[in-house]
A protein has these predicted regions:
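Short C-terminal domain-edge/linker segments immediately following a structured domain
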Residues: 90-91, 109-111, 120, 127-130, ...
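Ankyrin-repeat TPLH-centered helix-turn motif and closely related helix/turn capping elements
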Residues: 100, 111-122, 128, 133, ...
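Charge-rich, low-hydrophobicity low-complexity segments
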Residues: 1-81, 128-254
């Protein structure tokens, strides 16, 4: 009989049970309060990751990932390293996020600040009091992780927020942070605790001004459902009157 051995030595006869155990052991943070939860560089290596049911925690995923799902999190600071696909965040309140991803979607969230790199326009649904600012993450391995996630740090649509629940495009559910409101040092102490002094040393790789044509669109909102695919969203843009985002030609096939 074939046995499946998990990374901690636990053995399973059933392959599905082994896979579930491995994911929940190594790629999940769940049911924690007042804890610091860290995955360092090289510990995720492009795998999906789940975060759920946290309160008053600090979470740092300092590696490139596949899809990340975040559910039912309150009063927490969360750093999500480069995701090659999507980050889905639901039912979160009073949180601060630093996120790098290809696609970002919020649903049923309230009073959150988001320091963002997103290769596509971020989407919010049934969410309120959301604040957005440019990505503020800096550490030595970050540039390599952007490459591994196939993300161009110079193409950042952090400000192009689409609000599904604002048909009149009033912008009452979200706003852009003024630069003087940003906390540029929010991760400095946590990174110093999680990484070596050498690994903390780095230059900024995501420029502040890297939206299409250097313009920040404050009123260019569109409406999409939480399940709208990126292809459907892009087709809506092509059929509408709003200016289209300009993507680097090297990424047209992504």
């Amino acid at each position: 009989m074939q046995l499946f051995t998990a990374s901690d030595g636990t053995q399973f006869k059933d392959r599905n049970e082994w896979r579930k155990y491995e994911f929940e052991t190594n790629y999940t943070f769940r049911n924690k309060a007042q804890e610091t939860l860290i995955k360092g560089p090289g510990s995720i290596c492009g795998q999906p990751f789940d975060v759920s049911d946290l309160k008053d925690c600090v979470v740092m995923l300092l590696d490139h990932t596949d899809q990340v799902q975040v559910d039912h999190v309150a009063a927490t600071k969360m750093f999500l390293g480069p995701s090659s696909t999507s980050v889905f965040i639901r039912n979160c309140s009073d949180c601060v996020f630093t996120i790098a991803c290809k696609q970002l979607r919020f649903r049923d969230c309230n009073n959150c600040t988001v320091y963002l790199y997103s290769f596509t326009a971020p989407i919010i649904e049934t969410s309120s009091d959301m604040r957005f600012a440019p990505f503020n993450g800096i550490y030595r391995q970050l540039s390599k992780q952007f490459e591994e996630a196939r993300l161009d740090p110079h193409c950042n649509l952090w400000s192009q927020v689409y609000d599904f629940n604002d048909p009149n495009k009033s912008g009452h559910n979200w706003r852009l942070l003024r630069q003087e409101e940003e906390d540029s040092d929010i991760w400095k102490l946590f990174l110093q605790q999680a990484l070596s002094e050498e690994d903390c040393m780095s230059e900024e790789i995501v420029p502040r001004k890297c939206t299409p044509n250097g313009n920040v669109a404050l009123d260019g909102m569109q409406s999409f459902t939480f399940d709208t695919t990126q292809e459907e969203a892009q087709q809506t843009l092509w059929n509408g009157n709003e200016p289209l985002p300009i993507f680097p030609s090297a990424f047209n096939s992504v």
